[in-house]
Swiss-Prot record:
Keywords: Ribonucleoprotein, Ribosomal protein. The keyword Ribonucleoprotein applies. One of its GO terms (biological process) is translation. HAMAP family: Ribosomal_bS21 (MF_00358). It comes from Rhizobium johnstonii (strain DSM 114642 / LMG 32736 / 3841). It comes from the Bacteria. The gene is rpsU1. This is Small ribosomal subunit protein bS21A. NCBIfam families: S21p. Belongs to the bacterial ribosomal protein bS21 family.
Length: 79
């Protein structure tokens, strides 16, 4: 993975690198590989993730159809 450092701005380059790693799922994989996961625990985790994904898709579908209100956006203060 490669990140360009512009004008010796290392902080910005680190933020970009961290965002890229997050998108690629590197942090999740490193956490998963740090310790052995029993096959039964892996199945349970994957099943829970699948259920979570299905609920999220169903919720989004209902929101698109207008049966559920859209989530309220949180206004964050500007810098």
């Amino acid at each position: 993975m490669q990140v360009l450092v512009r004008d010796n701005n290392v902080d910005q380059a680190l933020r970009v690198l961290k965002k890229k790693m997050q998108r690629e799922g590197l942090f999740r994989e490193m956490k998963a590989r740090s310790a052995f996961e029993k096959p039964s625990e892996k199945r349970a985790r994957e099943k829970a993730e699948a259920i979570r994904r299905q609920r999220k898709l169903a919720r989004k579908k209902l929101q698109r159809e207008g049966l559920l209100p859209a989530p309220k956006k949180v206004l964050r203060p500007t810098r």
